């Protein structure tokens, strides 16, 4: 079955369908959708990430609504009770992002385009993994500042692909942010050489990070290597993370020419 009227409640599915040339199927989007920029003018907004206007969605008569994980379970349940087909993605890894692209291709009968898109990303990731680095800098990714939360799995994987070392790899596999909460004194002993921060849409303040008690001798603080990566580029498990998000990590680790 090829779905013709799709509502996307996550940013990454919106971007993916546009990249596949299937934007004509989209009848509604999350309020956070900004990629590509023209989506703001082209598609009606039907809610935020953990809330949605069910009546507005129903009025659009979708034959499919795309959601993400347990975070949107209540929304999905309401849609299902209304008789609307729902597909819930639950990916949190680079491999999962690539599978999401291929699944969207299958749902819209454009498997060739989806395979080409995913294969292109895979080729670049493979090439980057094979790049030799004389030193792999230790990297701390801060997903939130209060409490401090370390990076989710796909972010950790992209740091490794870019040539860095995630200093909390044991936490990256934890899907829930509450299980990646850190006390401030847990970071200095791991001596990150680069700090990447993306505070879920809130502006990162490097001076606030640098001023944390006990952090003054952290190598990244002493070297001034605190870099913000905008949340839409790295915290959505989709094409943005594999392109602009990865590019931002590369630039932070190796300079703008990387």
Language-model features: locations:
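N-terminal ligand-binding lobe of clamshell/alpha-beta domains
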Residues: 1-258
């Amino acid at each position: 079955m090829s779905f013709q009227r799709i509502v996307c409640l996550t940013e990454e599915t919106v971007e993916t369908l546009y990249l596949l040339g299937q934007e004509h199927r989209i009848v509604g989007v999350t309020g956070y959708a900004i990629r590509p920029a023209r989506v703001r003018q082209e598609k009606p907004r039907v809610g935020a990430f953990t809330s949605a206007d069910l009546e507005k969605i129903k009025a659009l008569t979708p034959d499919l609504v795309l959601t993400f994980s347990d975070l949107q379970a209540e929304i999905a349940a309401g849609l299902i009770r209304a008789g609307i087909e729902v597909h819930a993605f639950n990916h949190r890894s680079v491999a999962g992002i690539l599978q999401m692209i291929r699944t969207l291709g299958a749902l819209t009968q454009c498997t060739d385009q989806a395979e080409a898109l995913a294969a292109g990303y895979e080729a670049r990731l493979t090439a980057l993994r094979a790049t030799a680095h004389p030193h792999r800098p230790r990297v701390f990714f801060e997903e939130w500042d209060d409490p401090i939360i370390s990076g989710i799995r796909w972010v950790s994987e992209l740091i490794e692909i870019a040539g860095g070392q995630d200093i909390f790899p044991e936490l990256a596999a934890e899907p829930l942010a509450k299980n990646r909460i850190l006390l401030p004194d847990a970071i200095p002993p791991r001596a990150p050489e680069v700090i990447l921060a993306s505070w879920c849409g809130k502006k990162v303040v490097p001076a606030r990070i640098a001023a944390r008690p006990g952090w003054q001798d952290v190598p990244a603080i002493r070297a001034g290597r605190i870099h913000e990566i905008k949340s839409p580029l790295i915290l959505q498990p989709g094409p943005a993370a594999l392109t602009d998000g990865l590019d931002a990590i590369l630039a932070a680790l190796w300079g703008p020419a990387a």
